[in-house]
Structures are given as structure tokens and as C-alpha cells.
Amino acid sequence: MSLFLEHTKPLITTMLKPNNTADLVRDITAALKEGTDAFCLEIELMKTECRTATDYKDIFGAMDNKPCYITDYRRLNINDTEQSDEELTEEMLFAFSLAENVKLFDIRGDLFDPSPDEITYNEKAIEKQIALANEVHKMGGEVLMSSHPLRFLPYEDLLKIAKAQQERGVDIVKIVTLAESENELRENFEATLKLKKDLEKQFLFLCGGSHCRKHRLLAPLLSNSLFLSVQRGIDGGPQPQMDDAKKVMELSGIENGKWKMES
């Protein structure tokens, strides 16, 4: 099984948006035909009645053994009943345990202690995050830690969050900010190159906002990380369609839609 860390080119990863099993399987089938490398199942978008072992097995089983990563974000959860971080974690661990191709586990940077910019500095919460990362590793998985400040950050603040994540035993650092002007876009490109130099871990630095598109299309090439995209005809917001992601990779000299394991 190919893991999310074992690639030499940006990994085209299809973000799955439907809220029910039938539509998820439909979109997975379409993404496979378009040539996706991997998937992300956003559990927070799924209906409660679809979060069962049978449904998860149908969903993961449709992926043709492509690697999958999972999220369960508090701020996007469509559940009618608010779930605690502990409940969200148990829900993720349950899904994670059901299929061998589910390999990447997203831990929010403020898990167990909701905090500004989705990053906590509370020692007890950090200890629980580290313990969770260790548990996922023991299960044979990899860990991504994500923070979504969803505002522009100067590099010093960005690096502080990235290094805090890096120190918590995770494999991939992920931060999502904003670019609402050409100047913020330029600084985000500069930050991408600086992070590549200043971080030891693989990272995924993205942005939303009115000026995010260039960064969304080019940043994965600069960081050689995951290329988050959606399949043809799906509204992914700031996430580009897979066709565009593959075209950028092809034009940049990277084999279209493919990646090779390091020898």
C-alpha cells in the first residue's frame, strides 16, 4: 500500500464532498476514471446515518486500494447534535480501523482545546494530541496536523504554528490562511519557499480568499506535497478541479497525474 509520505511528485488527492454513501461511491468512481492518486473523506460532511461500518467499508472499498486520508472538523460538522472533540476522535479512529487503504489521519491543531487560529498551546491538550498521533502510528498510519486560521498571517506567525505542529509527532504540517490581495498572495508564495527551508517535516500550506487560485495551483509543486482537488463538475470552492491540477503538473514538466515511489 502506497503511503502519503512515499511519493516524489505532488499527490493528486480528490476531496470528497457528498453527504451520503451512494453519492460518495459515485464520485469515487468518477475520480478514479479521471486518474486521481488518492482520496480525502471529509467525515464532517457525511450524514449521521451514513457513519456506520457498512457504509465506511462500501466507501473505502470503492477506492480501488488508492490511499485515503480522513478529516472530521468540528467547524464544518453537519451533525444536528454537537460532538465533543473526544467523540470526533473516536469517530475517526473507528473509520480509520476499517480499511487498509485509510492511511492519513488529520488531527486539528486545537484538538481538545478549541483555540484561535486552530492551534492550542495548552500542555494537557498537546499531550493528548501526541498520544493520539502515537496511537495512529501504532495502527500503521500517518498523521497530518491541520490549522485553519483562515486569515492572512505574516511569516513569523505562520512559522510559529508550523513548528508547534511539527513538534507534536506528526508527519505532515498543514496550514490554511487567506490571500485577499496581490501583496498577500506574493507573501504566501514567499512563505511557501521559506517553509520548505525552515521545516523538517513535509508540509501543506494553502490559502483561500479572492487571490488564492494561483497559490492553490502552484504551491503543491513548490512543496512537493498533496494536491487537493475535486473531480470534474464539482464545486470545490478554492480547491481546483483535478483536470486543472493535472494540466499544471504536465506543463511544469511533471508526468501528468503520476508519481513514483522512491527507490
Residue ranges and their predicted role:
Residues 4-138, 142-155:
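Active-site beta->alpha loop and helix N-cap motifs at the rims of alpha/beta catalytic domains
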